[in-house]
Structures are given as structure tokens and as C-alpha cells.
């Protein structure tokens, strides 16, 4: 598990197995799993926590100017009042080496470059760890590991510029003391890796929960341990063999920092469900993404918009019920 550097260059059979049978079963049934980070990746994540703390300590205008928000909440710096602030990376911005790179405030050039280099290093390490888990999943499902070739094209390293972006992202959070929360939700992608510096992340125990009485478990709260979450795309590709991991963030009196890497399918190729034992139909990457997004409330946007999204969802459900009657 320590040697991740050559995972993307392995022979056709893919990287060596990582997860034992019982952990694969847990990931399938619960939709989540705790795993120790390889030492190199743990060190990189520790560096990223330090760099992100320096970034979040900057004045608001400097953060917003350094990473302007766009694509809703899917790119750049964003604040949710009384809950959290976060920066979303989908490509390099200040270290891209192109004229299109943003001009950061002069006083923070060095720290921004350090933040971005460390984020790119963490992206690579997290992606290769999740790639190993996906290869385990393929073998466990009696599939060839090559099923991930097109789906992961361009996702295993931070893209150099916006025109090379896929849906995959790395997000740095600072949750405010006591009030920093995230409502229960599942993620959209294939697998998500979460590491926090303090407690607050909780996962749903599907085996003991009912609709009326959910049972929440404290997830790993150490910088050397990651929580792996299965997402809605993996659920769809596996034909519901893998549940999506339901999770939330509850308030911590001291606040909380976290690193979240969401590995999502590539936008460069159609997705062939036939490779995963389906009926052989192919969908465009963008169409699959829109399908996965349907009915989802964006828990990382401001409360007013979350409420509006829920209202729209309830209205659509009511209209569908009328049509069925």
C-alpha cells in the first residue's frame, strides 16, 4: 500500500490488490470505509492542511480574488455563511504556466504557489489510492481492470488548465467552530476520499438504521486515516451492487479542516455500461452527469439556495405523482 508512485504504469492486470474481501463487502453494503493513508500521502495531506490554513487566514477579498468562484460551487473560493468556507480545485490556476493564469495578490504569490503544488501532489496520491480500490472492485466483480481506462482518462492528475478539466475535483474545507455543518447527503462521483483534522464527519450505519431512527457513526478524525465513500456514479455503474455512502458533518466546538478528493468519471469519453454487465448501452459523459445530478440538493451552497432546490424537487415529485394517477 505504501508504493503508489507507479500505479498508473502497472501491467495490464493493474496494481496489486489493496482491500481484503470483508472490506469490499463493507464498501458495497455501507457505502463507506476507513483506510490508513500510505505514509507518503499522509505527509502530503499534512502539508496541505498547513498550506490551506495559511490560505484561509488571508482576508476574504484576497481569497476571492485568488480563486474566483464559477460553475456554481464547482470551482474556486466559496463561503457558506455561519457554516464553512472552501476552495475547489479542478485544475491549476497560478502554477499553470500560461498567460491565462490569474494574477494573485503580490503578497501571497509564494503561499498560493505552495498551496497549489501541494494540492496537485495530494490529487495524484489520492487518485492513485482510489484507482487501486476501483481495480479491486473490478476484480471482485469479475471484470477486467481495463473497464476504468476511458472512465478515468485525465482524472488521475490535476489538469494543467481549464480546457483540460474533467468533473473530478479536490476541495479544501474550513468549517467554522460549532456551527460548521453539512447536511446528510451522498456524493455524485465514483469514490470520494475524505480526511479531517478533527471529529465531525459522520457516516450512516445502514445495517442498524431505519427511516425513523438513523444511526450515525463517527468517521475517522485523524490526518493519517481516510474515509472512502462510494458515490452515485459507482452505484449506477455497479447496478446498485454498491450503495452510495450517506454522510454528514456535525458541528465541532473547535472548528474543523478537511481535504476532500472526489474522483468522478471523465468527460472525454462515452460511458459503456456494457463493460459493467449492463445491456450494452452507451451514454455521453455529460448525459450521465446530468442524470446523476437529478434530484440532488447541493449541500455546499448557501441555505437559501438549498431550500429552493428542495422546493423544486418536491414540486417535480408532486407533478410526477399527478401524472401517474
Residue ranges and their predicted role:
Residues 1-79, 127, 131, 135, ...:
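C-terminal flanking tails of non-heme Fe-dependent oxygenases
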Residues 81-128, 133-138:
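Non-heme Fe(II)/2-oxoglutarate
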